[in-house]
Swiss-Prot record:
Stretches for region NMP: 30-59
InterPro entries: Adenyl_kin_sub (IPR006259), Adenylat/UMP-CMP_kin (IPR000850), Adenylat_kinase_CS (IPR033690), Adenylate_kinase_lid-dom (IPR007862), ADK_active_lid_dom_sf (IPR036193), P-loop_NTPase (IPR027417)
Pfam short name (any one): ADK
Binding site for ATP: G10, A11, G12, K13, G14, T15, R127, A200
Source organism (scientific name): Novosphingobium aromaticivorans (strain ATCC 700278 / DSM 12444 / CCUG 56034 / CIP 105152 / NBRC 16084 / F199)
GO molecular function: adenylate kinase activity; ATP binding; zinc ion binding
Gene encoding the protein: adk
Coiled coil: none
Catalyses which reaction(s): AMP + ATP = 2 ADP
Record's subunit section: Monomer.
Taxonomic lineage of the native organism: Bacteria, Pseudomonadati, Pseudomonadota, Alphaproteobacteria, Sphingomonadales
Name of the protein in question: Adenylate kinase
HAMAP family assigned to the protein according to its UniProt record, in alphabetical order: Adenylate_kinase_Adk
């Protein structure tokens, strides 16, 4: 089974992808992670990508496609893949079809985590973590039992990510919509797109995704 998982930053894609990995033994293919790993390992594709990046240029679709092909070739035949961050354009969608078909695979599901922009802004801008142990909290939804003290380690210092601000979140939402708009109709025409309420409880989101996978 091969899945594309869509959703803006903060929608919970990472959590749901990890649960799919744990439950179904699938492999998460994140283009960013694959690129960094290939460059570090100095594979032929990695060296090509490194040269492009050092020249200050964007990594081409051809290089990304080669990375994905290499990853799929290294996977057992029966292992499913979760595509994260790819495809983002119509040409990339066509390329992915060709990559999968040449390896006897096909795309089974495109699952989009649907979110309310205002609610997502509230979710992201309110989150913070303990500077000592990393336990997560939220201004509204998950406060420490004792204000100013971490429930887990008793620490008193907390931190927020610098990009967890409203302007950045809304910019990322706009970028996400612009990037996914061209590819969704391609997959909708095949009847493989499903939408899940990404604002629901994480366990409910997982249950909804599992129901989609079980239905086909």
């Amino acid at each position: 089974m091969n899945i594309i998982l869509l959703g803006p930053p903060g929608a919970g894609k990472g959590t749901q992808a990890q649960r799919l990995v744990e439950r179904h033994g699938m492999k998460q293919l994140s283009t960013g992670d694959m690129l960094r790993a290939a460059v570090k390992a100095e594979t032929p594709v990695g060296l090509k990508a490194k040269a492009v990046m050092e020249a200050g240029q964007l990594v081409s679709d051809e290089i990304v496609s080669a990375l994905i092909g290499d990853e799929l070739d290294a996977m057992p035949a029966g292992q499913g893949a979760i595509f994260d961050g790819y495809p983002r354009t119509a040409p990339q969608a066509e390329s992915l079809d060709a990559i999968l078909e040449s390896r006897g695979r096909k795309l089974d599901h495109v699952i989009e985590l649907d979110v309310n922009e205002d609610a997502l802004v509230e979710r992201i801008t309110g989150r913070y973590t303990c500077a000592t142990c990393g336990k997560g909290y939220h201004d509204k939804f998950e406060k420490p039992a004792v204000e100013g003290t971490c429930d887990k380690c008793g620490g008193h210092e907390f931190k927020r990510r610098p990009d967890d601000n409203e302007e950045t979140v809304r910019t990322r939402m706009a970028e996400y919509r612009a990037k996914t708009a061209p590819i969704l109709p391609i997959y909708e025409s095949r009847g493989i797109v499903s939408r899940v309420d990404g604002m629901a409880d994480m366990d409910d989101v997982t249950a909804a995704i599992e129901a989609i996978l079980a239905a086909r």
